[in-house]
Amino acid sequence: FQAEDGIRDVERSRGLGDVYKRQNIATRMENKLGDIEDGFRKADFIVEHESNTKPTHQGYIEPQASIANYSEGGTIEVFTSTQGHHVFRAQIAKLLKMDLSKIKVVPAELGGGFGGKNNVYLEPLAAQLSRKANRPVKMVMTRDEVFRATGPTSGTNCKAKIGCTKDGRITAAQAELNYQSGAFPGSSLPMAATTVFKRYDIENVLVIGHDVVCNRPKVAAYRAPGAPMIAFAVETAIDELARKIGLDPLDFRLKNGAKQGTICLLYTSDAADEGLGV
């Protein structure tokens, strides 16, 4: 075979079909609220901002580590560094085709996680090896293996467009989210796409998102999965818009903050007036 260059950039991957046979966009999301075109027509000022972020690993001190012990009664006990022992238990049962009641997962003292230990890696392997050998099996990743085989957060390309009136009321907000998922579909795009403008009271919103596969490790959660990357683009645009109309960025945010019962995409919004005590 002939080695080819990997497709690691989210924007490059969107335009190619080399990772998967059909296309590299695994999922497309579009969420609407109100009339986005009318909202921008009513705006006196419009700001657009584009940002790119790189994949970032959670950087926990303790690597993934598991001990599995298969007993003659057909049960398996797994001691592991995890943030989700019930999920791990269910996945081990599914992969090993065992009854859920035959598996016990004991979460050990966690040496850091930040979302990165929500995913199953070593546990089914240790459990299967223990079942085959009929002896306890311990597996620990090296730091190199952690970086190569576990999931970082998505690399992203995010675009935000926001318009407001002269008195500082946001009339429309639009965002495009392009999130790397790694070699397999399934990034934190859905959470990011449904919460991108959740902090604000905006009548006209359009959010378009793409889950893009590329030649990287499958991504995992990392501290408010998906939110920081799009927040970087949106909040930068908010700052620029506030400066453009001569309003303090904090006052601008408070003026447009979500209130009790504010309607937003898919979910009822948080109340900034209550949360901030204003």
Predicted regions and their residues:
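Positively charged, low-complexity/disordered segments
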Residues: 1-16, 270-273, 277-278
